[in-house]
Amino acid sequence: MKSPDEVLREGELEKRSDSLFQLWKKKRGVLTSDRLSLFPASPRARPKELRFHSILKVDCVERTGKYVYFTIVTTDHKEIDFRCAGESCWNAAIALALIDFQNRRALQDFRSRQERTAPAAPAEDAVAAAAAAPSEPSEPSRPSPQPKPRTP
């Protein structure tokens, strides 16, 4: 299992700004097993992090001659547009890391549900076993004496 800090991919990625002109800003992207960190060009600025628990999907992949354009859709349905060099395949790397994260999370949820229901299961099994088990043999039943018919 990969540690959350293990870098899966690192390199240049461009993010479309939310400003009026929607300029493409170069970022240094660092992809780990639980997030995508975007470092701005200026070294003093803090990175922005897109954690996978807040991402729904990687969508709208379009290829042009030089770039691959894709959109990350967040859980609050915000769309963030990116582009990268065609050969870098950032969109595929992010999509695969997201799927891996979602699979791990689904397994954790499943295991935690099993652990919560596990203490109740032995009690249910004991009740079912008691109902299915034959009762302990009791004393053999004696035939009840029949009254003799009266003769006149």
UniProtKB/Swiss-Prot annotation:
GO annotation terms (biological process): animal organ morphogenesis; apoptotic process; placenta development; positive regulation of apoptotic process; regulation of cell migration; regulation of embryonic development; regulation of gene expression; regulation of glycogen metabolic process
Alphabetized InterPro entries for the sequence: PH-like_dom_sf, PH_domain, PHLA1/2/3
Residue numbers carrying Phosphothreonine: 151
Modified residues (Phosphoserine): 3, 42, 141, 144
GO MF annotation list: phosphatidylinositol phosphate binding
Biased composition (Low complexity): 118-138
Protein name, entry field: Pleckstrin homology-like domain family A member 2
Organism: Homo sapiens (Human)
